[in-house]
Amino acid sequence: MYPLFETLCIENGKIQNINLHQVRYERSLREYYGKSAVKIFNLFSLIQLPTPLQNQLIRCRIDYNAETTQIQYFEYQRKIYRTFQPVICDDIEYSLKYSDRSLINTLFAQRGACDEIMIIKNGKVTDCSIGNLIFRQGKKWYTPDTPLLLGTQREKLLQEGKIQERTIFQEDIVNFDEIKIINAMNGL
């Protein structure tokens, strides 16, 4: 069984944000397994993209446990998400990228006619089912300071100064001009 996973973007044969994924992978292993011995792999060395996929947009999924990994490659088409259904869940915990997404899937099923959900925890906006959220107000982009998962794309955009953290309550959502999903496959 693989309790954790990473999703990486490979665009035209180049792995995106590999260093941030490596850091999160190692941190997640240590947090999940505590003081138990773990085998840490170099993710870059593990990825062997098949030649027919070299010039495509690829979603690479690495499932892992304390001793081994399993890698899968999928062609990917970016989507535009226009509508978000707020769903309240005060007891959700997703600080690690868990393979068991049953609670997230249950919440996603509540989206109704919307494209995606917006998870509200203790009155604050957190994430959606597949990534972090960013909110545009005028020319500035903000991301909730209460994410469920510290995403690698979110971290990259924060480091670059392209987005800023702030508390976003559910009632604040109407004050923004645009909402976007960011994750390994979708940047700003």
From Swiss-Prot:
InterPro entries documented for this protein: Aminotrans_IV, Aminotransferase-like, BCAT-like_C, BCAT-like_N
Coiled coil start-end: none
GO molecular function: catalytic activity
The protein's name: Uncharacterized protein HI_1169
UniProt source species: Haemophilus influenzae (strain ATCC 51907 / DSM 11121 / KW20 / Rd)
